[in-house]
């Protein structure tokens, strides 16, 4: 019997990679190798510059050739790898500092073991402390398909003392249910298979702000699971030109093969309906001359991100851990009071968790010792109370700290560059057993039965003068590896389609996973 699991997927921690190198060494052209010419083109899944040839369990962790050919990039890649693999700590000095005050996971590898997708959360309470659980919660309003405002988009189930987690994960329960399809879960030859899907319940008292009386009602909400995906080769996907991506959308729209067509929120009548840009003054370099450029959405299941330099991985390094950096000097918070007026907006920054934390007697009792470690020299006077017996003063100080947009930098620029060099520098393992008749036959069948339409086998990258919406990196920045004019084999059209799963993905639209 074969077992298949239907995972409800959506976001992604997809990570990004950047590096520092000299201006004339950011491209690498491999020398001709007679042995290379004996393999079919599809053997080189990442092209000549982005393919790795290791076949062990570490195959997804290898650097691309531009990384290996550049000593400085190679060292940055190794440093970035450590930032991905090691846990962040709640101390306020030293390496990998600054975890919290509320956070989703303490490391990237918690969700991406072996740099691939995570394993599923077993039945029972949702838990994120073990490395390997690649499930994230999607808590949304089914009336609007939008995320609920009383939690962050990626719900935070942990907090550093004296703060309390916005969500009590022990009160989020997962049940895996059996599903029978229209064919009775049997292949034509009689072989059977299992289909399963998760049913997730979240008790109202799992939400800290509601327990503290800040939220009176959670309203209509539903909970899904989303699975992380692999992060290798994302630099190669970023190197596909915007024009080629648009041509793929236009072709599929014109073909009209899909019963549900294309997601018209992104593309309609041959043109983009919307594209990605980042115009937040908190994020974008004020001296960035190319700010506000628009580029197609191409990353995450939900197509929530555009260029890799501001995509899921670069963002996750901040919002999963709540570790600040020079272009993210604020905390990742819920937006429950975003449309409110008065103190809910001006004092508590629109966040229900901030309001609950600021007025929680237990949080207030531990706040003085906490903030004196964070800001021992009192460089931020509003974060401190003059009289810690005055509950109103303490509440204001807590709120000022949690909502500040001038937090001290916890990940310095050099570490962030290292992380991005690593992320953009991850190679794709070469195809295996390319001479095996069964593999060759399988590839032919894959194309014959139509899988290759959505799972487009290959693309050719453009010039790869990549763009960073934050303005941290310049266009085609020499500190990062580039992959121009490479034939790559991601087996994805990078377009969203409807999968019609039980307890379907939020919005029902899911990008074809590379």
Residue ranges and their predicted role:
Residues 103-115, 231, 419, 442, ...:
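The canonical Cys-X-X-Cys-His
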Residues 17-45:
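Bacterial Sec-dependent N-terminal signal peptides
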Residues 128-142, 146-149, 153, 434-512:
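His/Asp/Glu-rich metal/cofactor-coordinating catalytic motifs and the adjacent surface-exposed loops
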Residues 418-432:
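His/Cys-centered metal/cofactor-coordination and adjacent catalytic loops
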Residues 89-99, 122, 430-437, 441, ...:
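Surface-exposed patches in mature extracellular/periplasmic domains of secreted proteins
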Residues 35-63, 77:
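N-terminal regions that are enriched for targeting/export leaders
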Residues 55, 62-76, 85-415:
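Extracytoplasmic redox metalloprotein regions
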Residues 1-19:
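Sec-dependent bacterial lipoprotein signal peptides
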């Amino acid at each position: 019997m074969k077992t298949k699991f239907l995972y409800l997927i959506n976001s992604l921690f997809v990570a990004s990679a950047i590096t520092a190198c000299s201006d004339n060494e950011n491209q690498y052209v491999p020398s001709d190798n007679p042995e290379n010419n004996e393999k079919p083109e599809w053997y080189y899944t990442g092209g000549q510059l982005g393919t790795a040839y290791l076949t062990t369990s570490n195959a997804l962790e290898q650097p691309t050739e531009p990384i290996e050919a550049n000593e400085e990039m190679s060292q940055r890649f190794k440093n970035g790898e450590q930032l991905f693999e090691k846990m962040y700590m709640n101390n306020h000095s030293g390496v990998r500092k600054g975890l919290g005050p509320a956070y989703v996971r303490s490391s990237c590898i918690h969700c991406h073991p072996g740099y691939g997708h995570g394993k599923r959360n077993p039945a029972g309470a949702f838990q994120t402390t073990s490395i390997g659980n690649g499930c994230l919660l999607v808590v949304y309003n089914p009336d609007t398909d939008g995320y609920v405002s009383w939690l962050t988009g990626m719900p935070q189930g942990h907090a550093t003392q004296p703060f309390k987690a916005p969500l009590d994960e022990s009160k989020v329960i997962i049940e895996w249910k059996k599903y029978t399809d229209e064919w009775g879960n049997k292949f034509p030859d009689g072989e059977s298979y299992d289909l399963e899907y998760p049913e997730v319940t979240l008790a109202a008292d799992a939400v800290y702000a509601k327990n503290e009386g800040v939220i009176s009602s959670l309203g209509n909400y539903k909970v899904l699971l989303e699975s992380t995906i692999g992060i290798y080769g994302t630099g190669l996907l970023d190197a596909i030109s915007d024009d080629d991506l648009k041509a793929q959308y236009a072709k599929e729209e014109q073909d009209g093969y899909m019963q549900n067509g294309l997601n018209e929120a992104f593309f309609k009548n041959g043109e983009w309906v919307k594209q990605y840009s980042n115009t937040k003054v908190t994020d974008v370099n004020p001296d960035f001359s190319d700010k506000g450029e628009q580029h197609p959405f191409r990353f995450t299941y939900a197509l929530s991100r555009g260029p890799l330099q501001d995509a899921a991985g670069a963002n996750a390094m901040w919002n999963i851990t709540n570790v600040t950096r020079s272009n993210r000097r604020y905390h990742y918070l819920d937006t429950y009071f975003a449309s409110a007026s008065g103190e809910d907006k001006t004092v508590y920054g629109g966040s229900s968790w901030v309001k609950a934390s600021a007025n929680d007697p237990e949080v207030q009792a531990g706040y003085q010792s906490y903030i004196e470690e964070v800001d021992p020299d009192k460089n931020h006077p509003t974060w401190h109370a003059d009289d810690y017996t005055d509950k109103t003063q303490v509440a204001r100080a807590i709120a000022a700290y949690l909502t500040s947009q001038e937090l001290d930098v916890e990940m310095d620029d050099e570490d962030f560059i290292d992380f991005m060099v690593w992320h953009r520098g991850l190679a794709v393992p070469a195809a295996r057993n390319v001479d095996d008749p069964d593999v060759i036959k399988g590839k032919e069948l894959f194309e014959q039965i139509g899988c290759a339409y959505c799972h487009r086998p290959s693309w050719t990258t453009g010039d790869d003068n990549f763009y960073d919406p934050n303005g941290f990196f310049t266009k085609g920045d020499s500190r990062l590896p580039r992959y121009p004019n490479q034939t790559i084999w991601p087996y994805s059209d990078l377009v969203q389609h409807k999968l019609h799963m039980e307890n379907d993905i939020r919005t029902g639209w899911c990008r074809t996973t590379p």
